[in-house]
């Protein structure tokens, strides 16, 4: 039995009912999260419970664990786990340099800026001479990402899901760039998994005909709290 599975089985009983936010659970939760990262596992409930306990018990706050939680939830994109994790961190904590670096990575992925992400990972990124430049020390980003097993693969799968809803056809050269310079074999594996059809001797992939798959749906607007606040303030 893996360390994560063993700790999770203990926590499944320990964080139920009124005992969920018992501060005595923090140490076990942190150990479980560290095992979760190293074994490339995932449990949203454990991550969210830990952040809530940090809110309720500021003396227990552990920034190193919060960084791991943010990175693990980021790996679930396009699900909203990362957004939830961000909003469970007290505003007095979010300005720390270490968390800001994580948030800058998250902002790249939330905006689907895969090209910059992979340039950072390859060491090709050159920071701008600008006060707003988020990656003044680009060499730190690969160290953060490579310490989390499966992160790069999760970004590739996220990119594939974005491609699925964005492109009808995509050139192979662009596809390779969006997936971080993968090999021809890997491109074929992703194409097979997502049902993309090679055309023009494999230089273009047909993704899907979006016009033929349009469905009526209810659209739920998701506004960030700061945007919502500014909208309300303007109308007061």
Curated annotation (Swiss-Prot):
Keyword Cytoplasm part of the UniProt annotation: yes
GO cellular component terms given for this protein: eukaryotic 43S preinitiation complex; eukaryotic 48S preinitiation complex; eukaryotic translation initiation factor 3 complex
Q: Does the keyword Protein biosynthesis apply?
A: yes
Keyword list (alphabetical) reads:
Cytoplasm, Initiation factor, Protein biosynthesis
- Give all residue intervals belonging to the PCI domain: 42-222
Where does this polypeptide localize?
A: Cytoplasm
Tell me which InterPro entries the record gives: ARM-type_fold (IPR016024), CSN8_PSD8_EIF3K (IPR033464), eIF3k (IPR009374), PCI_dom (IPR000717), Transl_init_fac_sub12_N_euk (IPR016020), WH-like_DNA-bd_sf (IPR036388), WH_DNA-bd_sf (IPR036390)
Q: GO molecular function of the protein, one example?
A: translation initiation factor activity
Enumerate the Pfam families for this protein. CSN8_PSD8_EIF3K (PF10075)
Assembly with partners or alone: Component of the eukaryotic translation initiation factor 3 (eIF-3) complex.
The family annotation for this protein states: Belongs to the eIF-3 subunit K family.
Known function? Component of the eukaryotic translation initiation factor 3 (eIF-3) complex, which is involved in protein synthesis of a specialized repertoire of mRNAs and, together with other initiation factors, stimulates binding of mRNA and methionyl-tRNAi to the 40S ribosome. The eIF-3 complex specifically targets and initiates translation of a subset of mRNAs involved in cell proliferation.
Q: What is this protein called?
A: Eukaryotic translation initiation factor 3 subunit K
Q: Please name the source species.
A: Brugia malayi (Filarial nematode worm)
